[in-house]
Amino acid sequence: MLTDYEEQLWNSMERICGIDEAGRGPLAGPVVAAAVVFPRWFRPGKGILGRMNDSKKLSPSLRREMAPAIQDAALAWSVSVVDAQTIDRINILSATMLAMNRAVGGLGLTPDMLLVDGNRFSPETPVAYRTLVGGDAYIYSIAAASVLAKTARDAIMSSYDRDYPEYGFARHAGYPTAMHISAIRQHGRCPIHRFSFKVRRLNEA
């Protein structure tokens, strides 16, 4: 993956920010968003950053190796976490928008353009943006944000695994796998579960 999309924008602006989230679909844990701004005319080269892809297509070990390289290469980056209790209170869409806006706010600079993975965004500041469905598969800065968000969330879920080992959070990261559903049947929900998320397999309305 190259920075072709960003290069078109760099002709007329400087600070292009990629934004993505991890954790909209799980039954437990936070939603995490990341924002990444690379220097103007950045090129990934042939090293670890030359292997960039949608984080879902990268192995966990490669994501962990890539994340610090992204942070070192970026002009600015930020990660924001919105917990399960907030998700239950304001709903997952609003929580995702909150996480994304907090990530942008944590950059320490004002981007000229936001490139947001997906089809919806509600900016809290007056900045130009584009929503791009599947953007993490072809836009470098969005893919980089997806790696930072996914890596951060995986680390959080691994820490929760130590607190609640009976659920296996390190293995499924809170997603509704058969293992996770079975654990909820046996143990009920724990404090990091999203109580507003209902599961048909648990006969919840």
From Swiss-Prot:
Disulfide bonds: none annotated. It is found in: Cytoplasm. Residues 14-205 form the RNase H type-2 domain. Keywords: Cytoplasm, Endonuclease, Hydrolase, Manganese, Metal-binding, Nuclease. PROSITE patterns: RNASE_H_2 (PS51975). InterPro entries: RNase_HII (IPR022898), RNase_HII/HIII (IPR001352), RNase_HII/HIII_dom (IPR024567), RNaseH-like_sf (IPR012337), RNaseH_sf (IPR036397). It comes from the Bacteria. The keyword Nuclease applies. A divalent metal cation binds at residues 20-21, 117. SUPFAM superfamilies: Ribonuclease H-like. It catalyses: Endonucleolytic cleavage to 5'-phosphomonoester. One of its GO terms (biological process) is mismatch repair. It is an enzyme of class 3 (hydrolase). GO terms for molecular function: manganese ion binding; RNA binding; RNA-DNA hybrid ribonuclease activity. Manganese or magnesium. Binds 1 divalent metal ion per monomer in the absence of substrate. May bind a second metal ion after substrate binding. Its EC number is 3.1.26.4. Its cofactor is Mn(2+); Mg(2+). Its main location: cytoplasm. GO terms for cellular component: cytoplasm; ribonuclease H2 complex. Belongs to the RNase HII family. Endonuclease that specifically degrades the RNA of RNA-DNA hybrids. NCBIfam families: PRK00015.1-3. This is Ribonuclease HII. It comes from Chlorobium phaeovibrioides (strain DSM 265 / 1930). The gene is rnhB.
